[in-house]
Amino acid sequence: MTFRSFAPIMLARGLLDELKAAKGSVVNVTSIAGSRVHPFAGAAYSTSKAALAALTREMAADFGPLGIRVNAIAPGEIDTAILSPGTEAIIPQIPLHRLGTPDEVAKIIYVLCTDTSSYVNGAEIHINGGQHV
């Protein structure tokens, strides 16, 4: 849990001068398991992702005055090589009735790094096809 929780802040602090100069943006990757019980996640993973969501908000407050925005994305079921066995059983419960794609996740990260989201700070965007509505 320590790595997932503290690596992002250590990295951002290490790049603070560069982030300030660029009026940069940090995007942390949490998980839908950080806000709701997930059948495959487990306590350690879920707790670490919830901690990262809280850290994102704190970082947004700390880094915002420096012109650095900090947000997070919380992917749900995304079609990657690390899908848990049994994920197919969850698909009917997702309102869009499909898995997300890595490209869909990447596009949200991209938007969070551009001026399109210049007033978005401290947000956690859930990318889950409506799984938690």
Predicted segment positions?
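Alpha-helical segment proximal to the catalytic Tyr-Lys
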Residues: 17, 61-65, 118
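Catalytic Tyr-x(3-8)-Lys segment
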Residues: 85-104
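A short helix-coil junction within the Rossmann-fold of NAD(P)-dependent oxidoreductases
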Residues: 14-25, 36
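Active-site helix of classical SDR
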Residues: 12, 48, 56
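Residue(s) in the substrate-gating loop at a strand-loop-helix junction
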Residues: 31
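C-terminal substrate-recognition "lid" of short-chain dehydrogenase/reductases
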Residues: 18, 101-127, 132
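Active-site loop-to-helix junction immediately N-terminal to the catalytic Tyr of the SDR YXXXK motif
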Residues: 37-46, 58
